[in-house]
Design a protein with these regions (language model features):
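A glycine-rich, often tryptophan-bearing local segment used as a flexible ligand/cofactor-contacting loop or short
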Residues: 62-131
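Extracellular ligand-binding/catalytic regions of CAZymes and related secreted enzymes
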Residues: 1-3, 29-30, 47, 162-171, ...
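Oxidoreductase and adenylate-handling cofactor-binding alpha/beta cores
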Residues: 99-106, 135-151, 190, 201-214
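Extracytoplasmic/secreted proteins, especially bacterial periplasmic and envelope-associated proteins
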Residues: 18, 22, 71, 127, ...
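Catalytic beta-strand/loop cores that center a nucleophilic Ser/Cys/Thr
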Residues: 27-28, 35, 50-51, 113-181
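Helical hinge/lid and interdomain linker segments adjacent to catalytic or ligand-binding clefts
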Residues: 3-6, 15-90
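Structural detector of well-ordered beta-strand residues that form the stable sheet scaffold
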Residues: 81-83, 153, 185
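Residue-level signal for short, function-critical loop segments
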Residues: 8-11, 190
Length: 214
């Protein structure tokens, strides 16, 4: 049986427990033995981590020790998949640049806060986005600093209404990448649990998890 770990905590505004309750059952339905952890100390147990197929980080605006960070980075570099979303993965540890390098991006702004915007699928061949069309979100439109080595699957375009100087900027929303031997998947969607009521947002996330899992 494949094994997945969901590590949830940090800022409660991103509803980590509610989001865990969405995706843990979806992983179990796909044959995963899912472990839930509400402590970053789980990253200190390298023997346990190396037995995993997938890690789902769901921890916003936290503080991670160098030892905990090294444990996570080492596990993913060794081949354990990493797949997450929104601030739970890309606004997790603002002082840890190597972690951000692994993720492939870091949140910096969401102009206008909760707004209507469109997500545009740009790769219709990749299994994560195949068969999906552009769709609308009513949530935070993440403005991010991103790694040019990411394989971008979906984007969004900023209107400039809430920050005129970024009018027309095309920003990655969904990407995948490698961290040594480990597959890394990220989606900036999912500010709160109800964002996954949008079928495409949920489908992209679960497909991304399946792709990342070794």
């Amino acid at each position: 049986m494949k094994k997945a770990l969901i590590v949830f905590g940090g800022w409660e505004g991103h509803e980590p427990k509610l989001c865990t309750e969405i995706f843990a059952p979806l992983l179990r339905e796909r044959g995963y033995d899912v472990t839930l952890s509400d402590t970053l100390d789980i990253y200190l147990n390298q023997e346990f981590l190396q037995g995993l197929n997938l890690i789902v980080p769901l921890w916003t605006m936290g503080t991670i020790t160098k030892e905990q960070e090294k444990g996570l980075l080492t596990a993913v570099a060794g081949g354990v998949g990493l797949a997450g979303w929104h601030g739970g993965m890309a606004d997790a540890f603002r002082n840890n640049t190597e972690y951000q390098w692994m993720v492939g991006g870091q949140w910096v702004a969401h102009p206008g806060n909760i707004i209507d915007y469109e997500v545009n699928i740009i790769d219709h061949e990749d299994p994560i986005t195949a068969g999906l069309s552009d769709f609308k979100m009513h949530s935070e439109q993440y403005y991010m600093h991103v790694d040019p080595s990411n394989q971008v699957l979906a984007t969004t375009t900023f209107s400039g209404e809430h920050a005129h100087w970024v009018n027309g900027v095309v920003m990655p929303v969904v990407w995948k990448r490698m961290w040594d031997k480990g597959r890394v998947f990220y989606s900036s969607l999912g500010h709160v649990a109800r964002d996954f009521d949008v079928p495409e947002a949920k489908e992209i996330q679960i497909r991304g998890m399946m792709w990342a899992s070794r």
